[in-house]
């Protein structure tokens, strides 16, 4: 099993309820495939670097999880099919990045 990180941007026209519902949909896909969700972060509404589908802002989310590589194609297919997702990026964390992510999570816990 490998560690993965998925960052995705949702369209800004969604209500808070729709945003939570969409994020839970992707988390449910991971859980159904027996992935272990390590961390999730809501980065909130942020300005995009360039317009995407005539939108200049979007809701950013990060999911860190541990799973087999077979789940990635299923998750990315769902990202592509969902019209609420503007962009997404999923990648495998290497050893150095895993250490960095752990330090970042610990720092976030300390600030809360």
Curated annotation (Swiss-Prot):
A GO cellular component entry from the record: ribonucleoprotein complex
Gene3D superfamilies: 3.30.70.60
Pfam families, per database record: Ribosomal_S6
TM stretches of this protein: none
Glycosyltransferase in keyword set: no
Keyword field: Ribonucleoprotein, Ribosomal protein, RNA-binding, rRNA-binding
Top-rank taxon: Bacteria
GO biological process, one term: translation
Molecular function via GO: small ribosomal subunit rRNA binding; structural constituent of ribosome
Database matches in HAMAP family: Ribosomal_bS6 (MF_00360)
Job description of the protein: Binds together with bS18 to 16S ribosomal RNA.
Similarity comment: Belongs to the bacterial ribosomal protein bS6 family.
NCBIfam families given in the database record: S6
Protein name, entry field: Small ribosomal subunit protein bS6
Organism: Azobacteroides pseudotrichonymphae genomovar. CFP2
Gene that this polypeptide is encoded by: rpsF
């Amino acid at each position: 099993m490998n560690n993965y990180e998925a960052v995705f941007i949702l369209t800004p026209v969604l209500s808070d309820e729709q945003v939570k519902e969409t994020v839970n949909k992707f988390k449910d896909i991971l859980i159904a495939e027996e992935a272990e969700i390590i961390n999730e972060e809501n980065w909130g509404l942020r300005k995009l670097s360039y317009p995407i589908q005539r939108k200049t802002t979007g809701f950013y989310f990060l999911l860190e999880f541990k799973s087999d590589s077979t789940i990635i194609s299923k998750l990315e297919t769902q990202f592509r099919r969902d019209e609420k997702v503007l962009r997404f990026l999923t990648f495998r964390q290497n050893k150095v990045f895993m250490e960095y992510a752990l330090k970042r999570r610990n720092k976030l816990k300390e600030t809360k």
